[in-house]
Amino acid sequence: MQKYALQPSGFITKREAPPESAVYMHQVVAGTARYRYTTGNKVGICPQQKPVGFAPIFDMYGVMCLKQAEESVLASLNSGCSGMGRTETAPQQASFPVILMDELGFMEAEAEHFFRTVCALFSNPRYYIIGTVKPRGTRFLPVLEQMPEAAVFHLTLQNRDELYAQLERAQNFPAFLHTVGERQ
């Protein structure tokens, strides 16, 4: 992210070690994570059996993180990067705003407001979004795969090194997406 001057805003999730095994959502603003551990951002638990998500927390805190990320990206687009969206190439030295969604998966399954907010952001061509999505069994991946403008990378142990090498060789982030997207 530093190479391309990406300034992600959005969220990351972090699983705590046992015995708690709680999962917390942490807001990211302009590339800086704001770590806090409260019931207000505890989005689930991961016992040894099946993960359990807390839909009301995703619907409140998760949506708030995404709305603030969108505001941050819009502010960046309106100052300095005016008019730049997914279809245009950013200068390498320009700060490039990105919405970050770390690990969309099973825990969000019942969070309808969160799901609709994520899908609305996915479908907006003004934004670059970097997200990790579970490969199967979630509602997010089928939505992404139906969007012609989405570049979905199925990162595996077999292709990870080559994708990282392509990212290193690219002149800028949009060029990387264009190059790799043609091969998908």
Spans of model-derived segments:
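Hydrophobic, Leu/Ile/Phe/Ala-enriched alpha-helical segments that form helix-helix packing faces
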Residues: M1, A5, L66-A69, V73, ...
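N-terminal phosphate/diphosphate-binding loop that engages ATP/GTP or pyrophosphate donors
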Residues: Q2-Q49
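Alpha-helix C-cap/termination motif
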Residues: K3-Y4, Q92-Q93, N124
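Conserved beta-strand scaffold positions in the cores of enzyme catalytic domains, especially
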Residues: P8-G10, L100, V152-H154
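Residue-level preference for the first positions of well-ordered beta-strands
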Residues: P8-S9, F96-V98, Y128-I130
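A structure-centric signal for secondary-structure junctions around beta-strands
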Residues: E20-A22, S95, E149
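Phosphate-binding/switch loop-helix module in NTP-utilizing enzymes
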Residues: I45-H113, C119
